[in-house]
Amino acid sequence: PRLRRQRQMCIRDRYLDYMFIEIMKSIENNFDDPKVNELLNKHFIELRSVSPEGSSHVLDIPGLKDPSIRFWSLWEEEELIGCGALKTLEPNHGEFKSIRVADKFRKQKIGQKIVSHLIDRSKQLGFKKLSIETGSGEFFAPARKLFTSFGFETCRPFAHYKEDINSCYYSLNL
């Protein structure tokens, strides 16, 4: 797996009362890690439980190992904080998949870190457009709010997706 470190320094005030250094590491395609497997399995079970049959597009681990998909787990120190994947639909068009925040880190803006990381990686890979499919139910409202906060706009179904009352589709031009 490839490792990438991001560093961010936050200074409380101009007198330097204290300095907080946050180190987040990103590991690509580490499906052998038990913590990653546990998080993904929980993600699959939960999404399949809230989506009607035929409307769930969540990928299992073998699905995420497809050569068209790049998967990252994000860590702070030795704790898994979340994950996300990027699927190549066309040479300049990618789709976000399997975005998940570990339960312990919910409501701490980790979803924003994951989406930011995926957008940054998408730009590095030369994508010009990103898309995502998510659920239309109340359970998915936080995800929809997160994506629109990054400028994603509703769009028609893309790639293999079809109109579905249980799905919402979004895209972002980079």
Please place each PLM-identified region on the residue numbering:
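Short hydrophobic/aromatic beta-strand or adjacent loop that forms the aromatic wall/cage
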Residues: 69, 165-169
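Alpha-helical elements of Rossmann-like donor-binding domains used by nucleotide-donor carbohydrate transfer enzymes
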Residues: 38-42, 113, 117, 169
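Acetyl-CoA-dependent GNAT
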Residues: 26-93, 97, 102, 121, ...
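Conserved active-site alpha-helix within GNAT-family acetyltransferase domains
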Residues: 112, 137-156, 163-165
